[in-house]
């Protein structure tokens, strides 16, 4: 069991394994008792609870996997089926940054082609800089290949839904259906050799499955029912999102992010004339931003990207010294600051806000249970990795489940589920820890910390191999 501990064991990966503890920690939906099976129960090889982007993609990937051609898969979604008959001229304010690794997953079951035929915007550079100094880091590709894509969540869901319909003979989708109870047939420690998980739906019907996959968000009922501890905290911040019109048309292929003392602000390209805003700030300031008149809101955005009000002469002088030292040590060209586009107006009714926090499940798997996406981890949007982490979970879990199916193994066995957990916890805990550290490091204008992060950012920007490693890690 020790091998399953992630790198932040003391903080994010606490484990509890005794049967007594597991029984004591049963969540509000769990009933750890023997279940008398009914012949009327529907039986599935895999049930995915939660039909958002990650849950739907999980079910779709299983349905398109060659080794699952003879399996029965069920996707449970509490909401109604969403249809997108045609694209609105107005862009949605909820978008995702899709990494190259995520495009590989979406391409594997045909969804990426639908997305490309609808709309998405590639970005080829990413500039991140500090509002308290001249320090910056520029991520780009030597050959100016695409680094990633900004896609509306509705477009992603439509593409996945189309591909789910293509495997309707293998994947059944129950919309407006929510699990209200889960029952494991005995102590978790014995479940590898026991009957299956039993699920009760809101209409009173019941079903059984060899493997239950929880993709039901950061308030996951599956995680609570399994008694899996979740470590997390709120950031006392909200993210303000909006769709913005630029002052003039540009190639608009750069993703911009500036760290303010109140939180990061990001501008993500949607088209040559439109960008999406994600501004993380205090709850009070977020509410103020959402209620501002349009002119005030636009002025606040432009000021956040352009103003040097947080600069000090001392920090600027120290930053200049390091810049000159780097230039002497590395005579080759170091990425220089580019100027972000200015904003002219905001789409009507596109402003919204949502609270921010961090969360991480101590375990991703139990016998016959696996967690993916926000059910397993919740991250600050400054990393732009929320849905990419979920898609990375899918890629890993599909690998282990496909191998198990090919070898005729029990899909709910810990013998392969632990491989998925180890793989993803190593990646996700590192990303969560780095994101949380950056959030805290940049949430201050204290001079010693400003100097520390300024020198760190300048040094990182000068070391191309290190930047390439960061980009490669983020794309997994």
Curated annotation (Swiss-Prot):
It catalyses: 4-hydroxy-3-(all-trans-decaprenyl)benzoate + 2 reduced [2Fe-2S]-[ferredoxin] + O2 + 2 H(+) = 3,4-dihydroxy-5-(all-trans-decaprenyl)benzoate + 2 oxidized [2Fe-2S]-[ferredoxin] + H2O; 2-methoxy-6-(all-trans-decaprenyl)phenol + 2 reduced [2Fe-2S]-[ferredoxin] + O2 + 2 H(+) = 2-methoxy-6-(all-trans-decaprenyl)benzene-1,4-diol + 2 oxidized [2Fe-2S]-[ferredoxin] + H2O. Its EC number is 1.14.15.45, 1.14.15.46. Gene3D superfamilies: FAD/NAD(P)-binding domain (3.50.50.60). Keywords: Cell projection, FAD, Flavoprotein, Golgi apparatus, Membrane, Mitochondrion, Mitochondrion inner membrane, Monooxygenase, Oxidoreductase, Transit peptide, Ubiquinone biosynthesis. The keyword Flavoprotein applies. GO terms for biological process: ubiquinone biosynthetic process. Belongs to the UbiH/COQ6 family. This is Ubiquinone biosynthesis monooxygenase COQ6, mitochondrial. It comes from Rattus norvegicus. The lineage of its organism: Eukaryota, Metazoa, Chordata, Craniata, Vertebrata. The gene is Coq6.
């Amino acid at each position: 069991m020790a091998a399953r501990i992630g790198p932040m064991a003391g903080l994010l990966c606490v484990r509890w394994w005794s049967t007594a503890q597991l029984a004591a920690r049963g969540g509000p939906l769990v009933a750890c008792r023997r279940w008398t099976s009914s012949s009327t129960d529907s039986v599935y090889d895999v049930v995915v609870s939660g039909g958002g982007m990650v849950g739907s993609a999980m079910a779709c990937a299983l349905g398109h996997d060659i080794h699952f051609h003879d399996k029965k898969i069920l996707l449970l979604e509490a909401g109604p089926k969403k249809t997108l008959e045609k694209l609105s001229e107005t862009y949605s304010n909820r978008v995702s940054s899709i990494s190259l690794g995520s495009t590989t997953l979406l391409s594997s079951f045909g969804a990426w082609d639908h997305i490309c035929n609808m709309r998405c915007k590639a970005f080829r550079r990413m500039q991140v800089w500090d509002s308290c100094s001249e320090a910056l880091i520029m991520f780009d590709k030597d050959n100016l290949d695409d680094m990633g894509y900004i896609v509306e969540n509705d477009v992603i869901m439509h593409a996945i839904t189309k591909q789910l319909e293509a495997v309707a003979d293998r994947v059944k989708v129950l919309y407006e259906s929510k699990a209200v109870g889960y029952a494991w047939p005995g102590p978790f420690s014995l479940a590898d050799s026991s009957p299956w998980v039993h699920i009760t739906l809101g209409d009173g019907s019941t079903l059984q499955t060899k493997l239950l996959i929880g993709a039901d968000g950061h308030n996951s009922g599956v995680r609570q029912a399994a008694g899996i501890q979740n470590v997390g905290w709120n950031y006392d911040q909200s993210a303000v999102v909006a769709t913005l019109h630029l002052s003039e048309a540009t190639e608009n292929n750069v993703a911009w992010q500036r760290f303010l003392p109140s939180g990061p602000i990001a501008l993500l390209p949607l088209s040559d004339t439109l960008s999406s805003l994600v501004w993380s700030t205090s709850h009070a300031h977020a509410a103020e931003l959402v209620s501002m008149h349009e002119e005030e809101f636009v002025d606040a955005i432009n000021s956040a990207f352009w103003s040097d009000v947080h600069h000090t002469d001392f920090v600027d002088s120290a930053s200049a010294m390091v810049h000159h030292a780097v230039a002497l040590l590395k005579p080759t060209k170091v990425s220089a600051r580019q100027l972000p586009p200015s904003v002219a107006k905001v789409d009507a009714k596109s402003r919204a806000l949502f609270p921010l926090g961090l969360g991480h499940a101590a375990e991703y798997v139990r016998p016959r249970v696996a967690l993916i996406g926000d059910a397993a981890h919740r991250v600050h949007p400054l990393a732009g990795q929320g849905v990419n982490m979920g898609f990375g979970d899918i890629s890993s879990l599909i690998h282990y489940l496909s191998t198990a199916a090919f070898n005729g193994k029990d899909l709910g066995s810990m013998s392969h589920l632990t491989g998925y957990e180890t793989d993803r916890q190593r990646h996700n805990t590192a990303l969560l820890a780095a994101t949380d550290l950056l959030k805290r490091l940049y949430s201050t204008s204290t001079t010693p910390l400003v100097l520390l992060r300024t020198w760190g950012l300048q040094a990182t920007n000068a070391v191309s191999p290190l930047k390439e490693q960061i980009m490669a890690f983020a794309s997994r």
